């Protein structure tokens, strides 16, 4: 049978392929670089596994990299191929304030139970709880947040995977989130 491949085939050396391997136990996590990083209840550790290059317009108002300014410069796998992947580790009761992205964001619970909340079409907040390997995918522009709601040990971290589209995606905290952070003294003023 004659068959002509339609897609370009690429061969990759082992050395080059190993640059695309990230070992979880070797990843560097960061707990800062976002407007709400130090706000009580929002503490979390973010791991930049694939991509997340610093976006244009970073640190202008509430616009930032989804993983914060430090982590966005230290991807374990440094590629820009249309998507980004990271992990969040957090204790129960912890997660970011409401924010949105300029591209899709998909969450996959790896361990524990995670609550994914969003603002619905009537301006009210709704949520679903995700157990391990459950997935939710938010369209661009939808205000959302996530929180570890695992029952049991309050000192036991759980892990959430997130995948965000684009090459240098942007996150922006909502006006209400920024006002709360400012009112409580968590934003730098110039």
At which residue positions do the language-model features occur?
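Short histidine-centered beta-strand/loop micro-motifs
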Residues: 73-78, 96-101, 118, 126-129, ...
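Conserved short histidine dyad/triad with adjacent acidic residue
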Residues: 65-73, 84-101, 140
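His/acidic/aromatic-lined binding-pocket segments of jelly-roll/cupin-type domains
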Residues: 87-88, 98-99, 104-109, 128, ...
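Glycine- and acidic-residue-biased ligand/ion/polar-headgroup-sensing regions
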Residues: 92, 103-115, 119-121
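A short, N-terminal "cap"/entry segment at the start of jelly-roll beta-barrel domains
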Residues: 1-81, 189-190
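Double-stranded beta-helix
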Residues: 1-16, 143-190
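Histidine-centered metal-chelating micro-motifs
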Residues: 94-97, 115, 134-136, 140-147
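Short acidic-glycine-tyrosine-enriched beta hairpin
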Residues: 120-140
């Amino acid at each position: 049978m004659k068959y002509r491949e339609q897609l370009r085939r690429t061969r990759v050396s082992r050395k080059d392929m190993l640059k695309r391997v990230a070992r979880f136990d070797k990843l560097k996590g960061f707990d800062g670089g976002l407007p709400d990083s130090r706000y009580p209840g929002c503490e979390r550790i973010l791991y930049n596994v694939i991509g997340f290059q610093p976006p244009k317009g970073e640190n202008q108002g509430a616009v930032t990299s989804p993983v914060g300014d430090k982590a966005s410069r230290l991807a374990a796998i440094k590629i820009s191929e249309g998507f980004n992947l990271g992990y969040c580790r957090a204790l129960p009761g912890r997660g970011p304030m409401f924010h949105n992205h300029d591209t899709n964001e998909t969450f996959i619970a790896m361990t524990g139970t995670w609550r994914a909340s969003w603002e619905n079409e009537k301006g009210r907040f709704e949520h679903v709880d995700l157990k391990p390997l459950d997935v939710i995918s938010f369209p661009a522009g939808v205000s959302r947040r996530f929180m570890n709601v695992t029952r049991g040990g309050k000192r036991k971290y759980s892990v959430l995977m997130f995948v965000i589209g684009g090459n240098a995606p942007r996150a922006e905290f909502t006006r209400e989130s920024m006002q709360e952070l400012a009112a409580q003294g968590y934003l730098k003023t110039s």
